[in-house]
From Swiss-Prot:
Positions bearing carbohydrate: 120
Compartment(s): Membrane
Record's protein name: Adipocyte plasma membrane-associated protein
Gene, per the UniProt record: Apmap
SUPFAM superfamilies per UniProt: Calcium-dependent phosphotriesterase
Organism: Rattus norvegicus
């Protein structure tokens, strides 16, 4: 009894202190459907472990990857856009300045995320903090197309994330994941369930910006269809991909392309089979346990977690399960590539197909992975 009384006497003031602490998030309650069973084309495997790591410990957070010929380009966590050729890394652009060592440096340093090749061999890049840029890789010149400081329909852009561009280079479709949360607080955005993300359209000729879809929960990767009639948008926090029609008879409409995915989707890129590659750094295991699914309708617990623990601490409890899905042009799962405990591929953010290989980006790993499609 004495021990019990002591425990209670300690617990009551501790709980009181916890209640007085402010939580950085005001989580909303929502619920997921039961995740799809991981069998058939979703059956867990170790195919991603056949990948090889490139530039290990020479690149930090190569989120998105493009190629011009056999030359690769990516953006890194220290604010650079780099060229990768013949085993060498060369910086071709920076959008920020100053030290780039901690999360507090990110807004000043800049953080290049989505990257695409335009029709004239220039690179179009979004920086999470700075906006939309065009980079000439030969001249090393940088042109600001749209600043994050520019309000769009009265709302600022706090987390510019990914982009996709028409073949003629006129229209750029891009995501702003939140007007409240910045990239460095992406876990708070996911846990809060903030629905202030948007899909936007930028016209490179008129400089006009339009909001195509709003009230999205962490809109992330985007991909224009081969016919350029719709744009796919990964709504990460809801484990789904939306389809927004941008031309043709359906223009202005939107529907669901893939619902109730087995992972939380990041970037979307075309596959040579006419479908799409979708990367997911966190899965919704079934059978198994998904922390995000469990917490989705428990805002009180989420609030308490972030009263007590930092984002980095919480990330340590997220399984390092990398998943790459290939989906058809109608949204059906074609195949899945797994690294169940992140032995080789970790924190995967994108699968970029080129010349028989998948080049796998990551939002926090210090390398790129390359996987031969013939080997799987």
């Amino acid at each position: 009894m004495t021990f019990l009384m002591l425990a209670v006497s300690l617990a009551i003031p501790l709980l009181g202190a916890m209640m007085l602490l402010e939580s950085p998030i005001d989580p909303q309650s929502f619920s997921f459907k039961e995740p799809p069973f991981m069998f058939g084309v979703l059956q867990p495997n170790t195919k991603l472990r056949q990948a090889e790591r490139l530039f290990e410990n020479q690149l930090n957070g190569p989120e998105s990857i493009v190629n011009i010929g056999d030359v690769l380009f990516t953006g890194t966590a220290d604010g650079r856009v780099v060229k990768l050729e013949n085993g060498e890394i060369e910086t071709i652009a920076r959008f920020g300045s100053g030290p780039c060592k901690t999360r507090d440096d990110e807004p000043t340093c800049g953080r290049p995320l989505g990257i695409r090749v335009g029709p004239n061999g220039t690179l179009f890049v979004v920086d999470a903090y700075k906006g939309l840029f065009e980079v000439n890789p030969q001249k090393r010149s940088v042109k600001l197309l749209l600043s994050s400081e520019t309000p769009i329909e009265g709302k600022k852009m706090s987390f510019v994330n990914d982009l996709t561009i028409t073949r003629d280079g006129r229209k750029i479709y891009f995501t702003d994941s939140s007007s409240k949360w910045q990239r460095r607080d992406y876990l708070l955005l996911v846990m809060e369930g903030t629905d202030d993300g948007r899909l936007l359209e930028y016209d490179t000729v008129t400089k006009e910006v339009k909001v195509l879809l709003d009230q999205l929960q962490f809109p992330n990767g985007v991909q224009l269809s081969p016919e350029e009639d719709f744009v796919l948008v990964a709504e990460t926090a809801m484990a789904r991909i939306r389809r927004v029609y941008v031309s043709g008879l359906m223009k202005g409409g939107a529907d669901m392309f893939v619902e109730n995915m087995p992972g939380f989707p990041d970037n979307i890129r075309p596959s040579s089979s006419g479908g799409y590659w979708v990367a997911a750094a966190t899965i919704r295991a079934n059978p198994g346990f998904s922390m995000l699914d469990f917490l989705s309708d428990k805002p009180f617990i989420k609030r308490m977690i972030f009263k007590l623990f930092s984002q980095e601490t919480v990330m340590k409890f997220v399984p390092r399960y990398s998943l790459v899905l290939e989906v058809s042009d109608s949204g059906a799962f074609r195949r899945s590539l797994h690294d169940p405990d992140g032995q080789v591929v970790t924190y995967v953010s994108e699968a970029h197909e080129h010349d028989g290989y998948l080049y796998l980006g990551s939002f926090r790993s210090p390398f790129i992975c390359r996987l031969s499609l013939q080997s799987i």
